[in-house]
Amino acid sequence: MIVGPVKVRSACSHHLCPILGRVWIGLLPNEFSNLIGLSKYARICDWIMSRPQIQEEAVTMLADELQTRVKPDGLAIVMEADHFCMHWRGVKDDESMMTNSVMRGAFLKDANLRREFLSLLSKKNGG
């Protein structure tokens, strides 16, 4: 199952500039997983992203929270975000995006499952 893209907003903890992005969540539940409602994924993303932080930490915190709550056999998270510190400071580059991923369980161990998840994201984004 894939949930996303979920729009997220945060602030860079280094510069306190906005971070605007999207998150995709892949889950491979099992018979013992605690499935949550679809809107809860967006709420958890919003809760995690509501504090200043760096993107790498946010993705890991989101993975930890979902792993604890849902207990799936596999968990995959991809986050793509625009960092306004890149627009407003230093290089003033308004085209670069940062992408991070976390793969756990079956998504980490099974290359075919991981490839399927990433290819479905690519198709959703016109790739």
Question: Where do the PLM segments sit?
Answer:
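A domain-level signal for the structural core that forms small-molecule/cofactor-binding pockets
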Residues: M1-G127
